[in-house]
Amino acid sequence: MSELKPAAMSVFRLAADDPMTYVQAWKDSSGGKAIALFPMNFPAEIVHAAGALPVVVQDDPTPITEGRSLLAEFYCGYTRSVADQAARGRLDVFDAFVVADHCVQLLGAVDVIRWVRPDKPMHFAQFTSAMDDAWTQPRVAGRIEDAKREVETVLGVPLTSERLARSIAVFNENRRLLRELYDLRRSGRAWITATDMQTLIKSSMVMDIQEHTRLLRGLLAGLDAPAEPREDLVRVHLSGHFCHGPRPELLDLIEETGAMVVDDDLYTGYRYIATDVPESGDPLAALSQWYLDRNRNAPCPTRVTTEIDWDTYLIDSIEASRADGVVVLMAKFCEPHMLYYPELRKALDARDIPALLLETEHEGNPIETVRTRMETFIERIRRQPAAARS
């Protein structure tokens, strides 16, 4: 059971579970505009600095209906869900859309939005995927400047350095508070379920960031003293899912089988909050540096940085959190993850790190089959010699 107070979590959960209702309520109360962002690289600070609400578009857990005719079945669940939401009018609450592409499938989903709602402004930031070539930094800086001008045009607000600097500081504080919760969980000073942690991250992608930070401070202040560590639970690291969150019922199942999630590199997890924006110097240059730094702090298979790779990062993270094994969550038809996984698995096997691959789908996940596989995985780890587990 999580140490987080249910009452404190209720606001976060409402925003994470029903983001469109939150966005509409925010617009009604503030009179402001909401801008939709797509995973995983656009700096929300630019939109926030213009007085609008930046919202990372989440997948909708309801079955895909109208979207089935708009994208092929071999597109991942997130992109098909986005297309379906667009076709059903679920995304009409947004006043504009911004995408810093990293995936051909996501571009297809965004094209559906352009087709369904041609009246809505759509900006392609087109950030480079080669992170340390000679031309990378100036090209990224140019894309950041283009995005700034586009936001200024759509919202009619000049983005001064002062506005941008304030927004950078606001988002950095929120990320630091969320990382504090991660540190508490890794160290065993707090027991936070995987579902609750994902709720905190997802809600930060949706809510007004100042409101989210205020509630986070209260949540941290209200944490109970940690209970005695559960020695009977197996410590696991969750890895994967670059665009959308794993289903809460899947996360709950993982921990019901005798596991305790102590760390992750999920997009709706540590990957989203791993990197702060530098708070000194020119804000636009700082946002460019943030983009480049993200792949050093939490490498992604959609980006290439010389001498930085995901498998080394993952192994280091597992050792730092003292995890006994890793559960890899791969969204079905996620091509970047599928292409990188053999190298990842080879590195884990070379270090004798127990690993379980679970392929997830938008709907129709075989929960009982997953339960059996998880129980077997946990039992296999428990039968290892004690020295091998720590």
Q: Which sequence ranges carry the predicted segments?
A:
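Metallocofactor- and cofactor-centric catalytic cores in central/energy metabolism, strongly enriched
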Residues: S2, R13-S29, A36-M40, A44-E45, ...
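Cofactor-cradling patches in redox/metallo enzymes
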Residues: V93-V112, P299-I318, L329-R345
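Glycine-rich, highly charged phosphate/nucleotide-binding loops
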Residues: L71-R88, T302-D316
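Redox- and metal-dependent alpha/beta enzyme cores, enriched for Fe-S-associated oxidoreductases
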Residues: M40-N41, E45-Q58, H241-T306, W310-I315
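Acidic/His-rich segments in extracytoplasmic proteins that coordinate ligands and/or metal ions
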Residues: S81-T153
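Structural motif
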Residues: A34, D95-A96, G325
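TerminUS-proximal long segments
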Residues: D311-I318, A323-G325, L329-S390
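A charged, amphipathic alpha-helical module
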Residues: S2-K33, A141, E145, R149-D276
